[in-house]
């Protein structure tokens, strides 16, 4: 079935909302199951453990607040909780994406074929097995780009004042951009678009991608909803690829 998507790009919020609709399309649901199971098992267990630890971690983080900011503690405490949720949520969503990367790529490929009527070159389990080394190499590229930037931001958390005020905002913006890269990369990688070229393409529509990544980041922090976010984000990012990038970067049509 060829999609009714227009070629006119929409906002990142629109594509995120489309993701929730697309995962339910007949013929697509079976490709959603494996990414969904990985996310439910990993994120469900991780967040259950996290909420048992918050009573210890938050007071420790608040101990870095200098005396002159103590009067703002009632505002800083929620920021500290959000900071922990952001860092923790992104860390475990990264692990989940590593494990599910081949299946996310297959989901993006099948959805793109359904939206455009195009025929992908290799499909099914044998196509996945053949592409696993390349897919894992691509995940390493993303991780190598992400890690040094994440370390710098994490160091900011231990600077009194900055760690409880500025750092959470910077981390949220960074997470939004990184999640846009993470999920938009699946359709780009299906067409063998180099990682650097993919980032350059995303920067041409930075606001759209930041909107998409910000909503994905927010939903990653929400219990229960975060269990479904991986396949939803893959579908939303694939819809964005079809509208905004496919004409210029597609390898198969």
Swiss-Prot record:
It is a multi-pass membrane protein. Its main location: membrane. Coiled coil: none annotated. It is found in: Cell inner membrane. One of its GO terms (biological process) is sulfate assimilation. High affinity, high specificity proton-dependent sulfate transporter, which mediates sulfate uptake. Provides the sulfur source for the cysteine synthesis pathway. This is Sulfate transporter CysZ. The gene is cysZ.
């Amino acid at each position: 079935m060829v999609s009714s998507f227009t070629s006119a790009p929409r906002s990142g919020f629109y594509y995120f909302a489309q993701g929730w609709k697309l995962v339910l399309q007949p013929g697509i649901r079976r490709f959603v199951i494996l990414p969904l199971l990985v996310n439910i098992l990993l994120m469900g267990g991780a967040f259950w453990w996290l909420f048992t630890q918050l009573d210890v971690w938050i007071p420790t983080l608040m101990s870095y607040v200098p005396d002159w900011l103590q009067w703002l503690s009632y505002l800083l405490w929620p920021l500290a909780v959000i900071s922990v949720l952001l860092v923790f949520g992104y860390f475990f969503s990264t692990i989940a994406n590593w494990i599910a990367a081949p299946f996310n790529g297959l989901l993006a490929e099948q959805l793109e074929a359904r939206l455009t009527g195009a025929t992908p070159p290799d499909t099914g389990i044998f196509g996945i097995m053949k592409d696993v080394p390349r897919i894992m190499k691509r995940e390493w590229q993303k991780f190598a780009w992400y890690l040094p930037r994440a370390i710098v931001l994490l160091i900011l958390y231990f600077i009194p004042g900055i760690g409880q005020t500025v750092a959470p905002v910077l981390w949220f913006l960074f997470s939004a951009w990184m999640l846009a890269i993470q999920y938009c990369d699946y359709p780009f990688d299906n067409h063998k678009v180099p990682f650097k070229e993919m980032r350059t393409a995303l920067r041409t529509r930075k606001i759209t991608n930041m909107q998409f990544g910000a909503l994905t980041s927010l939903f990653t922090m929400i219990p229960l909803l975060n269990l479904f976010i991986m396949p939803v984000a893959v579908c939303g990012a694939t819809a964005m690829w079809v509208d905004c990038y496919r004409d210029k970067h597609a390898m198969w049509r």
